[in-house]
Amino acid sequence: MAIMPYIRQGTVIDTLVILFSTWAFLGLIRVIRRRSNTTSLKGPPSESFIFGLHQIIHKSEDSDALYEQWAAEYGSVYQLSGPMGTKRVVLCDPKAILHLYSKDTFGFVQIGIIRAFHEKYFGRGIIWAEGESHRRQRKALTPAFSNVAIRNITPVFFDSAYKTKAAWDTIFESNPTKDGIIIEVQTWMNHISLDSIGIAGFSHDFGSIQGKPSAVLDVFDSFSSVQPDAMSTLMFTLAATFPIMLKLPNNRHALFAKLHQTILEISDELLESTRKEEEGKAGGGRGDAKSIIGSLIKAESANSHLRISQEEVIAQMNVLLLAGYETTSVSLTWALIELSRHPDVQQKLRDELSRFAATDPTWEELTNGLPYLDAVVHEILRLHAPLNETTRVVADDDVIPLGTPLQTASGNIVDRISVGKGTTVSIPTRCMNRLTGLWGDNAKEFVPDRWLNDAKDQLKSNEIQGYRHLLTFIDGPRTCLGKGFAVAEFKAVLSVLIRHYTFEFPDGPETKVVGYMSIVERPRVEGQDGAKVPLLVRRVE
């Protein structure tokens, strides 16, 4: 009897060793096959087997400049070393980028760990879906983001801006002797974005502009006060190689879990209240197909050929609430920063908007009738894209065409490259938006005039096929469904703020602004605690 535990323990250990060895052997076979089917490319040498070049990129003050430097040195398509000896192909060639985006969700899919992350914290919605599932969900959501739908909800954006104006005017009236007031603008832009997506998307007013407490706002704000610790960064770096890392606790995972639970509770409440409201209407209507929540309810109907499940409905609401809050608030904050740095641009924009003293621009005027507002908005979207990279995995062996031939690691000149199934491929989207070869020598500068007709026609950026030749909203089947919503809100809010206030840095236009990691990267005035951007605000007389 005494020998039995020893035998069982030895058997278990032997079994584990065999399983691990088999896993490692099969992994090695996959790596060898993938690399044998992938063109050998040039690239910078690895700094570490464990981290590859991840630490260099992560710690860089300007990772976009690194990507551009490597493209200049190794060619517009090159190879980077990743964690644990992995490799990825980086595309900075417009033709290659077009190829990837055109085959997105089928030929190129999300990295497994990213998809698992999306499922865990946001559900099986449109950002999780691939292939036919993604196509079905996108079709179900499209009516809510049509031009007609956005035109109908544009007054909501103006209303949020005027609520902010009322709150700021109250501050001014309580300080009548002061020449100007210091306002931390990023917090206010967060409130505008949250209230706008709540009302326009879900017929729910979070009331954050008026100071109403909000559980979801508290969770969003917590991301700006808790930076990723060393363990979070290490786990994120290694998660693609060791997916179990996603299950281990760390400070960021705890915040995402809390965010998921909070948004889930709010989504359930909003969906149920809307169902009851619609069921109470005469004729038993199923919601207005032109609103976000109405489209979701319609698509949930068993009679719809685009039917989506209740789980998918909740997942869409989670994603739309998060995206509607994060991205627009960051863009608005960057706009106020750049206009504070460039008072001449700020005044030129104010002059264009001056004809709207007694009324607001219509949606048509916001879209086509205010060229300088359009130029300022798109220059912000170009220079300060909220996300810096798109990463995909090759679903099946493929050949990617190149616009510019390059020399491979073996010395051959090629106009296309082969990528094996399982190869990781990434596009440095923000780098492409700032690439000197596409946008000119002033690509890193804030120059709205580049968007005016004569200047724009001369740029090589026309080779990029994305929205307005930008990759801010990416392209292809996964191009941002809400880009029209985001741009309309951006323009409406900015038009109100610039008509009524001037903005500048308290310590002058040379004030340093740095990146600060929240859910997405946010701006922060150096020296401030958290993602804060205090500006000196004056009323326009």
UniProtKB/Swiss-Prot annotation:
It is found in: Membrane. Heme binds at residue 480. Cytochrome P450 monooxygenase; part of the gene cluster that mediates the biosynthesis of clavilactone A, a meroterpenoid that features a unique benzo-fused ten-membered carbocyclic ring unit with an alpha,beta-epoxy-gamma-lactone moiety, forming an intriguing 10/5/3 tricyclic nested skeleton. Cytochrome P450 monooxygenases claO, claP, claQ, claU, and claW are close orthologs, suggesting that a redundant function or pseudogenes are present in the cla cluster. These monoxygenases are not involved in clavilactone A biosynthesis nor its modification. Its EC number is 1.-.-.-. It comes from the Eukaryota. This is Cytochrome P450 monooxygenase claU. It is an enzyme of class 1 (oxidoreductase). GO terms for molecular function: heme binding; iron ion binding; monooxygenase activity; oxidoreductase activity, acting on paired donors, with incorporation or reduction of molecular oxygen. The chain crosses the membrane at residues 12-32. GO terms for cellular component: membrane. Pfam families: p450 (PF00067). Its cofactor is heme. Pathway: Secondary metabolite biosynthesis; terpenoid biosynthesis. InterPro entries: Cyt_P450, Cyt_P450_E_grp-I, Cyt_P450_sf, Cytochrome_P450_monoxygenase. It comes from Ampulloclitocybe clavipes (Club foot). It is a single-pass membrane protein. Belongs to the cytochrome P450 family. Keywords: Heme, Iron, Membrane, Metal-binding, Monooxygenase, Oxidoreductase, Transmembrane, Transmembrane helix.
